[in-house]
């Protein structure tokens, strides 16, 4: 039982959560302007509105322009506050509720994007960690932070695994119906973009790619037990997978891809940035953190608190003038 608890709630640095909060709340601001950006204009067409199951269960009111504009303003303010790790519980849960409703409206007009699942889960679990003392520079570790990150990791992986199950279900619960179909060829013909239009002449290659993607999604749960370099290779594989889908279909998975940061040791980012700043100061000839520079006219103080004479620092021009006056 203890092993199960440790797996679901490992003790990890809280700074990892603080950094991930900043990144994800900033991404939400990007998302509502680039990806799910149409709830306000869509709310002007109530006749096209077909609410999702979640909306029906929660009995949420139908969208209107005042409602969607209010959600937009709440998301703007809430994300700015939460990204700064201020009022993490209040701002975090407000953003989670507003963004869930916002995306539910945007996806109640005929198209549901499953790439937002991990992001929505992340917004709901990150506020549970509460205040992180020291924010990015925190040295505290807790199981609360580990539980939140594990939830995000599970949501990321299940984005792929549930996609594979959906393919099996839509094919009559057959393991071969989807990968043996011509769905990828059909998708490219429907939207001939990028590299995809050059692959139309190779339907067998496209079928091999379908099998590869299907098996990768079906076995994606293995990622949850990987560590070290194996985990890094898995993350790079899925990033490459998303780059490939963009190049052949112009379909991105940015909300899922950004949530892969839940697997990363983000706590190393703060010390790394401090080292970079220290190196730049050294190259510029200035003092690094914790050091002081000599100032002309200052006197040193010995261990007994008495002043001793220190050699003064002169400018090069003054040195040349003095040298010219000496015999």
Label each region the model flagged.
Residues 1-326:
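Alpha-helical membrane-anchoring segments
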């Amino acid at each position: 039982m203890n092993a199960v608890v440790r797996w679901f709630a490992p003790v990890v640095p809280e700074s990892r959560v603080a950094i991930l909060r900043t990144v994800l709340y900033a991404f939400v601001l990007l998302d509502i302007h680039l990806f799910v950006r149409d709830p306000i204009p869509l709310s002007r067409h109530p006749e096209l509105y077909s609410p999702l199951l979640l909306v029906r269960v929660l009995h949420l009111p139908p969208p209107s322009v005042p409602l969607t504009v209010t959600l937009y303003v709440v998301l703007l303010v809430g994300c700015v506050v939460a990204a700064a790790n201020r009022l993490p519980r209040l701002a975090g849960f407000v953003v989670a509720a507003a963004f869930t409703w916002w995306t539910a409206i945007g996806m109640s007009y005929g198209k549901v994007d499953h790439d937002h699942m991990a992001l929505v889960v992340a917004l709901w679990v990150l506020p549970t960690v509460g205040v992180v003392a020291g924010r990015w520079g925190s040295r505290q570790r807790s199981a609360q932070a580990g539980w939140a990150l594990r939830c995000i990791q599970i949501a990321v992986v299940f984005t792929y695994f549930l996609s594979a199950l959906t393919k099996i279900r839509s094919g009559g619960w057959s393991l071969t119906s989807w990968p043996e179909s011509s769905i990828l060829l059909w998708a490219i013909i429907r939207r001939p973009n990028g590299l995809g239009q050059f692959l139309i002449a190779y339907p067998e290659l496209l079928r091999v790619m379908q099998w590869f993607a299907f098996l990768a999604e079906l076995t994606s749960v293995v990622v949850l037990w990987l560590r070290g370099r194996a985990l890094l290779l898995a993350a790079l594989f899925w990033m490459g997978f998303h780059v490939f889908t963009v190049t052949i279909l112009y379909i991105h998975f940015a909300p899922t891809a950004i949530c892969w940061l839940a697997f990363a040791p983000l706590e190393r980012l703060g010390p790394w940035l401090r080292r970079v700043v220290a190196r730049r100061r050294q190259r510029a000839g200035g003092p690094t953190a914790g050091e002081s520079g000599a100032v002309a006219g200052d006197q040193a103080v010995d261990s007994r608190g008495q002043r001793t004479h220190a050699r003064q620092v002169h400018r090069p021009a003054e040195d040349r003038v003095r040298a010219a006056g000496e015999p």
